[in-house]
Amino acid sequence: MLTIISYFLFLIGALTLALVLFIGLNKIQLI
């Protein structure tokens, strides 16, 4: 049970980081 929760949190963190990097790259390209 604990491993599933930690894996889920890791997945959310990875998706959030990817989203932030994607938005940052788009802002750099727009400028």
UniProtKB/Swiss-Prot annotation:
GO-annotated molecular function: electron transporter, transferring electrons within cytochrome b6/f complex of photosystem II activity
Keyword Electron transport: yes
Residue stretches spanning the membrane: 4-24
Gene: petL
Subunit annotation: The 4 large subunits of the cytochrome b6-f complex are cytochrome b6, subunit IV (17 kDa polypeptide, PetD), cytochrome f and the Rieske protein, while the 4 small subunits are PetG, PetL, PetM and PetN. The complex functions as a dimer.
Recorded superkingdom: Eukaryota
Name of the molecule in the record: Cytochrome b6-f complex subunit 6
Keywords noted in UniProt: Chloroplast, Electron transport, Membrane, Photosynthesis, Plastid, Thylakoid, Transmembrane, Transmembrane helix, Transport
Organism whose genome encodes this protein: Marchantia polymorpha
Topology of the protein relative to the lipid bilayer: Single-pass membrane protein
InterPro entries per the UniProt record, alphabetical: Cyt_b6/f_cplx_su6
Cystine residue pairs: none
